[in-house]
Amino acid sequence: MATIAQLIRHDRKDKFKKSKSPALMYTYNSLKKKRTYNPSPYKRGVCTRVGTMTPKKPNSALRKYAKVKLTNGYEVLAYIPGEGHNLQEHSVVLIEGGRVKDLPGVRYHIVRGTLDTSGVEKRRQQRSGYGAKRPKEKKE
């Protein structure tokens, strides 16, 4: 522990906070061939692989994921939320931050209902998170 004299000479340094979604922090300048710091809530990318993954220990399932090559050059694993999807290799997707606790290495979510990703079919509740349109009311 630091003495009072040491604390008078030098302040305590704040701990550096690391980003939980680093791929959203940079953009790529193709003219200068450099990455520049430019944080954004979403990034566009192209699926290079779509598959399933088994979760960590107490859970059991086949979770859908996609490996996405982003416009800034990063290649990340992103979770595909909801039941059923239409994604395949070369699909253009939008990703946002947000990890999946039981899938190691998956730190991003794919936004449903944008670009090549369709919304979840027959979704009635919590539709906004799954890109589902409001169902038509039947007239009597």
UniProtKB/Swiss-Prot annotation:
SUPFAM superfamilies: Nucleic acid-binding proteins (SSF50249). PROSITE patterns: RIBOSOMAL_S12. Keywords: Ribonucleoprotein, Ribosomal protein, RNA-binding, rRNA-binding, tRNA-binding. GO terms for molecular function: rRNA binding; structural constituent of ribosome; tRNA binding. Pfam families: Ribosom_S12_S23. Residues 36-56, 117-140 are annotated as: Disordered. GO terms for cellular component: small ribosomal subunit. InterPro entries: NA-bd_OB-fold, Ribosomal_uS12, Ribosomal_uS12_bac. One of its GO terms (biological process) is translation. The keyword Metal-binding does not apply. CDD domains: Ribosomal_S12 (cd03368). With S4 and S5 plays an important role in translational accuracy. NCBIfam families: rpsL_bact. Part of the 30S ribosomal subunit. Contacts proteins S8 and S17. May interact with IF1 in the 30S initiation complex. Belongs to the universal ribosomal protein uS12 family. This is Small ribosomal subunit protein uS12. The gene is rpsL.
